[in-house]
Each structure stands twice: as C-alpha cells, then as structure tokens.
UniProtKB/Swiss-Prot annotation:
ATP binds at residue 596. It catalyses: tRNA(Ile) + L-isoleucine + ATP = L-isoleucyl-tRNA(Ile) + AMP + diphosphate. GO terms for biological process: isoleucyl-tRNA aminoacylation. This is Isoleucine--tRNA ligase. It holds the Pfam family zf-FPG_IleRS. Zn(2+) binds at residues 887, 890, 907, 910. PROSITE patterns: AA_TRNA_LIGASE_I. It is found in: Cytoplasm. Its EC number is 6.1.1.5.
C-alpha cells in the first residue's frame, strides 16, 4: 500500500507563481465585465459619505512613478473606506489647459499662426483628450478603481461653467482687480506665471557694485559722495528709479583713495575685502531714516534716483543700499508705490529691451548685461564685476530663467481675505502636521495672485470692456457667459462676436453707443484646478463639499492645496477639504532624483510588464510615503520576495482547506484547543492594528503587520505545528477540522485586509475560498475581531510558550550542527525546568507535536540537568537521537513502529488511522 495516498496533502488550483503581468489584465477585464465600480457604489449607498477628491494630473505623456505613488495611495484609501462602513465614490480628473499642450502641438509641426485661435484650441482639446485616454489606460492597469469612464476634465463644459461662476463670485466680493505690477514673467513662454509655476535651478550671473553720485544730499550727504548698490541683474539698471535703505540701520561715509562711498556700517569690513579697498576711513555715520529723500543720479541716464526707506533691506549681502526698479521687483514696486515712483519696465513680452532703455534697445535682457556693465565702467560707476552661481527662478515648463516684469494683469487680492484663509487652515487636519505650518506661512507671506495669462489654451477671463475701457463684470454677464460655456464650451469666446457673448439687449453706462470689447487673456491653470471644489464636488450629485481628503505631493502646498483653498475661502468662507495628506517625491535607490541622463528612471509601465501592478502597489504600501521615497530594481525585487511569501501563505491556507466547507465543517469556538484559540486571538490583534493603521493612513504599518503575521505567526509557528494534524489525521478528525476552522478565518481576513493593497491577488484568492458568497472581495467589509471572551491569560501562556519554543529550536539547531540529529523529527528532547516554565510545560501538550520532535520528556529542575544540557532562563535542554524506527507515513521516530503486524512500517497512531479509514474491510 502506498501510504502517501493516505496523507491529506495540500491541494489547490491557486498557482504558486503570481504571473501577475499576464493574470492582472485578465482580472481587470473581469472587473470591467462585472461593473465592479458600480457594484461597490450600489452596495455602499446610504452609508456615511467619504470623498477623496482627486487632484488632477496634467494630461500630457505617460505616467511616472510619482503618478503611480499618488494614485495607488488614493486607491488604497478609497478601497479601504468602502470596506469600512463608508460610501466612497472616486471620481478621477485631469488638468487639461496650459502651455505644455500648446508647446506639444507646436513641436509636432502645427503652425499656430496659419489658423484662428478657435481652430488652434480645437487641436489642443483633441490632443488633451488623447492624452487622457493614454493615461487612463495606465492608471487602470495599476488597478486603481474609479469612475474612469465618467471622469472630471477641466476642459469639460460643465467644469468651465462653474469656474466662471467662481471667478464671478470673487469679482462680486471685490477680490478681482486689474493692475500694473511686477509678476514672474517667462520670456520663453511669453506669459505671466504664478508662484506655483516656478522652480529653482542654479544660474551663473554677473555680480556688480555700482556707485550712484549724490545729486541733492538734503544736508545729510554731500555732492562728492556716492551711494553704492549691488545687483546680480545689470539688465535692470536702466529701470532704476530709487535706492532703498533700512530706516533703523546705521550707514557710513567711507573714504577710499579720494572717493567717498555710502554703505551700511555693518558691511564695511565685508566690502573692504570684496571691493579691495585699501585703508578705508570712516568719515561719519548716519541713521538710515535720515537718508530718506536724498536724490542720487542715475549713472547712465543722469535722471533722479530717490533714496527711499524699506524694511526689506538687510545686511545678508550687498551694501545695505538696495537698487530699486519698481518695474522689476515686488518689494521695489511696493516701496515705489509708497513714494510715487513710476513703474518703468523697459523689457517686452519676449524679453527684449525696449526704447525705454536707450542704448540697449533690441537686446535680449540677458545679453544686455554685458553692454550695460561696460557702459557703467565707461561712466566710472562700476566698482567691481565678478560672477556668481546662485539659485534662480525658472519656468517649470520650459526650464528657462524668468524675470520680474511689470505688466497689466488681473489679480486676485489675497490681502482682502488673508485672515479668513489663515483661520481656515487651522480648521483642517494636516498629515503630516508640518503641512499646516508650511501652508500657513506661505499664505501669510504671499502677495496677490496673478491670475491672467497671455496664452490661448485656457478658460478666458469673462470680462467685457466699455467704450471708455472700464471693465464690466456683473451678475448678469457672469451668469450668461457661464450658461454659454455650459452649452457650447469656452471656444465661443474666441469664435463669436463680442455682442453675441453678452446677454440680449445688454446696456452699460460705460458704453453709450452700445459698443463692447472683451478680455483676451485666459485664467491661470491653477485657477482651473483650484476651482474643482465647485466644478466637481458641487457639480456632481454623488460628491460633496468640503471633501474629506485632498492627497497630493508635497509640492502642492504652493500649488493645488493653495489655489483650492484661496478660491473656496473666497466664495464660501471655508476650506474645500476637511483633511490634507501629502506624500514625498520618488527618488532612485540611492536617494537621487530620477533623470533620463542618469539612466536611473523607474517607469511604472515597465514595472507592471515585468513584475505586475500588485508588486508596485505593495512597494507603495511598504514605504514611508510622507517623506521622499526610494525605488529601484533592487528594492522592487525585495518587495517581490515579500509578495512571494504572502502568496505562499495564501496557497498553503487554500491547499489545506480543499475539503473544508464552513457551513458543515466549522468547529465552534468553545470546542477549539488553546493553540487554535491563541491563533485567533493573534488574528484579532492583527485585524485591530491593521484597521487602525488604515484609518490613520499608515500603510507601511499595514504592510509590516501583515508580512510579519504571514511569516512569523503563521509560517514559522502555527502552520508549521499544524502540518502534522492536517496531513496525518483522518479528514474529519476534530483536531483537523478545528485547525481548518482557524485557517479559514485567517484566510478570509487576510484576503480582505490585503485587498486595498494587492487587489488583483486578493480577488484571485477570493475565487478559491470555499463557501464565500460574494463574487469579489471588493464587495465585502473589513473583518471584525472574532468573539473569544477574555484571552489575556491565554495569550500570556502561549507567548511564554513561544519563548520556550525559541530556546528549543536553538538547542535543536546546535545539535544538528554537531551531527547529533538530522531533521528535528529524529530528535528526542529532555527538558529541565523551574518555576513558571515548568508549570507551563506541564499544562501544555502534546509537547512533541508543539516542538515538532519525536519525543519530549519533562524531567527534574534546572539544577538536575546534566552538564551537556544547554541552559536558558529557567530551562535546560538535552537533545538526543530519538529511539525507535522512522514511521513511513508521518516520519516520527517511535518505538511503536513494527508493533502492528498489518502495517509493520507504521507507528501505532498511523497504523490505527490507516486501518480504520483507509483499509477496505
């Protein structure tokens, strides 16, 4: 007789290998066929609503690891919430306006000048929609569940209509105004930029010190004295109209080689070195406040340069006397307004010097640095020229430097509702907590928001002008334009006559002849996405404002978190979100920024083709995402190994439940032995800790808890001990059915708990679990702890046993190394124990099964142990070769092998089992 046939070995169709790159797309097709998103929504309808509002990625190009990190984090939260008592719809979105799409079309050979604005905008829309299709497919391949075929898109008519309403409401409250002031200007994009569109890179710039002769010293300075300024932008010298000093700083008149220079006293020593002054002599000192209204002379043009007071002046660098060009700097502009200085800006849209900079007109601003510096040298005003490398503002799209340039722009006046913004920030839950301080400080210190852009692909600013140039924004015009956009889209602004965009019969006192024009600038794209709380949360019936959560990268404190807060507080007085969660950036394995030139870019599509989406998702769960995270082939390989262990755990559990049907085979809790109840108690602990971690968005805790549970509590402990019961006992043995009961509960819980992280694998497991009714684990709820009563004593006892077992395993390993035994089933152990350990050993049983050896004897106290015994706390262990023969069926070494004539190669237990259940009588 082949005794292997009498062993109940694991049987399952659940494959050992995940083969995720092939199996996941099949699973996703099944989800699509069963309308899984709609089914989840239908199942949870009526529960408390949880809205995670999707910050829209830009519709251009393939997704990168930052996208993958972001979307998987969102998906894990939404999946968990829908299994944890909430109704959690997820509406993905896309940001579709702006320069990158214009540039992509131009690069592809589209000649913008050969067509109308409306025609070009139609091409932009076509391009954006193709990009959405491309990215949607990739996001869905990640296993992200959402309303993918009904997303929100910022170019959709309904969204644009709501955006116009937001603008109109802000205008109605007096928050929108037009002004000429310096804004970030990108010559490469020919447009104003918002702070969120700026990034910093190192740039080499000239560093010059320039002397401005005193023209009218106001009895404080003399005409032979010169005020020294420092700048790294010589091209702005033609725009100089003033010199700022700090009212509370002390200034010195310093004599050097017959010249007299005015600089901050605190910088004399630094300047002595920087300007190579020999034996400088301080002639007198003056308070900054006393220098106000002194008139200096522009070294090139001879015009007045007024000395003004400014709190922005510091001793950090320069001379303490700050070159002031109101057309080229925010602080310069503010102080210039105070003193009535003109806003001179001799640079055009493309960055070329205009006729307002005589002698330099037609030069690109950066190229004007050299001739301007040479001219200053000719005038005898240049004291020093060097070059420095410093961090400088660049256009985030073109990667080219930007300048400050005063132009006529539309602004949202943050000043008018700054206090409301700051109050709203304090009412939001921020994770990490430092997010609150970061945004609070940004909002506290930020200037007004420049919302106009000199481009064509975007939502037009819905403003008309009367015959006298007066801007017209009324409830009537806003509502009418909003309805036009809802019906026809915003392209009509560029296609129709102005009169056709106005309400029928519209009149206004600024246009006695009924003639009107319209604004041709578009809105900043941050106004688009920043209006999504209105365009999506209010517009869509299944959502609500405020959202429960906004979750984006930490760069969005100055981007979407900020713009959304600004528009929402402006029109509702409240933040659009109850909570904000931010994540870090994705770096390579060494913590370096990914770049094509370094060859260290990890591409999500490649990872999914090679390893599968569940591996990428498991990586997301494994990292501390609130800081910057690392990813590389090596790291993903380590995650794959963890996945393999989890999958093996699933497979072992399924394999040993092949003949278990919960309806008929489940054993009642009170019928379970101590070890089985202990395992369920450990499962309860894991369920509680994992659900708490999910609630707190601590996914790495979920990952470690479940990985450790699979490898330590299950594989290395319970499943190891359970094998004998599962394989050797007959099918319906109460101990075997009890073990299967525990395994079943563990399996169902593990499928549910891991479902938000590895949904493809969890659903694959679910299909193989006997007795489950739901067609997908996604249509179930998170597991609840099993009612076990008070288990504190039980846990204490078995925790203590695990410590004893660890000591026994060490002793067995040492005996194996010394060739005393082979496998642990060839061993017999004698235990000498004192105190609690002895009591524990006497209470537990059968010890040979628990230690997975052939024989265990509990002898005297530790003091009685022979010298060769291995000693541990309150325990000494002797390992010997077990006496008897090896049973052919269970591999235990037993003196009872050979005592049964029918089955002489079996131990007594196996002989009885075989005779009773497997021999035909």
């Amino acid at each position: 007789m082949d005794f292997k046939e009498t062993l109940l070995m694991p049987k399952t169709d659940f494959p050992m290998r995940g083969n995720l790159p092939n199996r996941e797309p099949q699973m996703q097709e099944e989800w699509k066929d069963m309308n899984i998103y709609e089914k989840v929504q239908a199942r949870t309808k009526g529960r408390p609503l949880f809205v995670l509002h999707d910050g829209p990625p830009y519709a251009n190009g393939d997704i990168h690891m930052g996208h993958a990190l972001n979307k998987v984090l969102k998906d894990m939260i939404v999946r968990y919430k829908s299994m944890a008592g909430f109704h959690a719809p997820y509406v993905p979105g896309w940001d579709t306006h702006g320069l990158p799409i214009e540039q992509a079309l131009t690069k592809s050979g589209v000649d913008r000048k050969s067509m109308s604005v409306a025609e070009f905008r139609k091409l932009c829309e076509e391009f954006a929609r193709k990009q959405i299709d491309r990215q949607r497919e990739q996001f869905m391949r990640l296993g992200v569940r959402g309303d993918w075929w009904n997303p929100y898109v910022t170019l959709d008519k309904g969204f644009e209509a709501q955006q116009v309403k937001v603008f109109g409401e802000m205008a109605k409250k007096g928050y929108i105004y037009k002004g000429k002031k310096p804004v970030y200007w990108s010559p490469s994009s020919e447009s104003a930029l918002a702070e969120a569109e700026i990034e910093y890179h190192d740039k080499r710039s000239p560093s010059i010190y320039v002397a401005f002769p005193v023209k009218d010293g106001k009895n404080v300075l003399q005409q032979d004295e010169k005020i020294v300024i420092w700048t790294t932008t010589p091209w702005t010298i033609p725009a100089n109209l003033g010199i700022a000093v700090h009212p509370e700083l002390e200034y010195s008149v310093v004599a050097v080689k017959g010249e007299k220079y005015v600089v901050a006293s605190g910088l004399v020593e630094t300047l002595e070195s920087a300007l190579e002054w020999e034996n400088p002599e301080i002639l007198r000192t003056i308070k900054g406040v006393d220098l106000e209204y002194v008139v200096a002379e522009h070294p090139i043009y001879g015009r007045d340069s007024l000395v003004v007071l400014g709190d922005h002046v510091t001793l950090d660098a320069g001379t303490g006397c700050v070159h002031t060009a109101p057309g080229h700097g925010e602080e310069d502009y503010i102080v210039g307004q105070k003193y009535g200085l003109d806003v001179l800006c001799p640079v055009d849209d493309k960055g070329y010097m205009t006729a307002e900079a005589p002698g330099f007109e037609g030069l690109f601003y950066d190229e004007a640095n050299k001739p301007i510096t040479q001219k200053l040298d000719e005038c005898g005003a240049l004291l020093k020229l060097t070059f420095i490398t410093h961090s400088y503002a660049h256009d985030w799209r073109t990667k080219k430097p930007v300048i400050y340039r005063a132009t006529a722009q539309w602004f949202a006046s943050i000043e008018n509702f700054r206090d409301e913004l700051l109050r709203a920030i304090q009412e939001v839950k921020w994770v990490p907590e430092w997010g609150e301080t970061r945004l609070y400080n940004m909002v506290r210190d930020r200037g007004d928001w420049c919302i106009s852009r000199q481009r064509v692909w975007g939502v037009p600013i819905p403003i008309f002008y009367g015959e006298n140039g007066e801007p017209i924004i009324t409830d009537e015009t806003i509502n009418h334009v909003s309805e036009l956009f809802r019906k026809h889209g915003s392209n009509v602004w560029f296609e129709w006559e102005t009169k056709d965009l106005l309400p029928e019969g519209f009149t206004h006192e600024s246009s006695p002849n009924g003639q009107f024009t319209r604004e041709m600038d578009i809105m900043d794209v941050w106004f688009d996405s920043g209006s999504s709380h209105q365009g999506v949360l209010v517009e869509r019936e299944e959502l609500d404002r405020p959202a429960d959560l906004y979750l984006e990268g930490s760069d969005q404190y100055r981007g979407w978190f900020n713009s959304s807060l600004s528009t929402s507080v402006a029109i509702t007085g409240k933040a659009p979100y109850k909570g904000v969660l931010s994540h870090g950036f994705t770096l390579d394995g060494e913590g370096k920024k990914m770049s094509k030139s370094l060859g260290n870019v990890v591409i999500p599509n490649d990872v999914m083709k090679q390893l599968g989406a569940d591996i990428l998702r498991l990586w997301v769960a494994s990292v501390d995402y609130q800081a910057d995270v690392r990813v590389s082939d090596k790291i993903l390989k380590q995650v794959s190994e963890v996945y393999r262990k989890i999958r093996n755990t699933y497979r072992f559990l399924l394999g040993n439940l092949h003949d278990f049907h919960p309806a008929t085979h489940r054993v009642a809790i009170d019928q379970l032995n101590g070890l089985d109840r202990y395992m369920l108690a450990k499962l309860n602990d894991v369920i509680n800790r994992v659900k708490k971690a999910y609630d707190e968005y601590q996914f790495s805790t979920v990952y470690h808890e479940l990985h450790n549970f699979c490898t330590i509590e299950l594989s290395s402990f319970y499943m190891d001990i359970a094998k004998d019961t599962l394989y050797v006992k007959h099918a319906d043995h109460p101990d075997r059915r009890a073990t299967q009961t525990v395994m079943y509960d563990v399996l169902v819980a593990l499928a549910k708990l891991l479902s938000p992280i590895i949904p493809h694998t969890a659903d694959e497991v679910w299909k193989h679990i006997p007795g489950v009714e739901e067609e997908s684990v996604q249509l179930t709820d998170m597991p609840e702890p099993i009612e076990l009563g008070d288990v504190s004593e039980l846990k204490q006892k078995w925790d203590a046993f695990i410590n004893v077992r660890d000591d026994v395993l060490k002793a067995l390993e040492n005996a194996r190394n010394e060739k005393v035994i082979g496998k642990s089933l060839t061993a017999a152990i004698t235990l000498y124990a004192d105190g609690d350990v002895r009591q524990l050993l006497e209470e537990l049983g059968p010890l040979d099964k628990l230690f997975i050896v052939s024989a265990v004897k509990v002898a005297g106290s530790v003091a009685d142990a022979p010298k060769e015994a291995e000693s541990y706390d309150d325990l000494a262990i002797v390992v010997e070769k077990a006496v008897g023969e090896t049973c052919e069926r269970c591999w235990v070494v037993s003196p009872t092998v050979g005592t049964n004539n029918e089955h002489p190669t079996l131990c007594a237990d196996c002989a009885e089992t075989v005779a009773t259940y497997y021999v035909t009588k």
